[in-house]
Amino acid sequence: MRRFLLVVLAAFSLLILPLGHAGSLDAAELQPLEIASKSGVHVFAVEMASTPEEQAKGLMFRRQLPEGQGMLFDFHQEQPTSFWMKNTYVPLDMIFIRADGRILRIAENTVPLSETLVSSGGPVRAVLEVIAGTCKKLGIAAGDRVTHPIFSGR
């Protein structure tokens, strides 16, 4: 009976373990990022997506994204890029950032689960995804400066 209970407990643990990552990002993986806008400096805690595998998954399958957190996709060099919202359940603001840390373009309030491509509108080094409404609420706009170690203009 004891062995049976241990097996059931182990199986249950494996089932609920992935749920812990469905919401907020793991604090051990978060890095600070700042955006200086006309309304002030805004600090975010971001998870890095630097490998092709991390970038392909992105924020897919997550059911929530807390305010002040996000995911930073680092392409390691400037390039035009496009994103979609396939398997992404929360609406996002996508912030397209040049290598010098300047915001090139923002796609606000993207539609969850949409397979419509959202273009960077030019070459970018990175894309920051945050919860929809963040840019409007904080007054973040194209031309604002992002500070993080991956950007040359830090």
Where is each model-derived feature located?
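Positively charged n-region of N-terminal signal peptides that target proteins for export
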Residues: 1-4
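Bacterial N-terminal signal peptides
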Residues: 7-20
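Compact, glycine-rich, soluble single-domain proteins
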Residues: 23-154
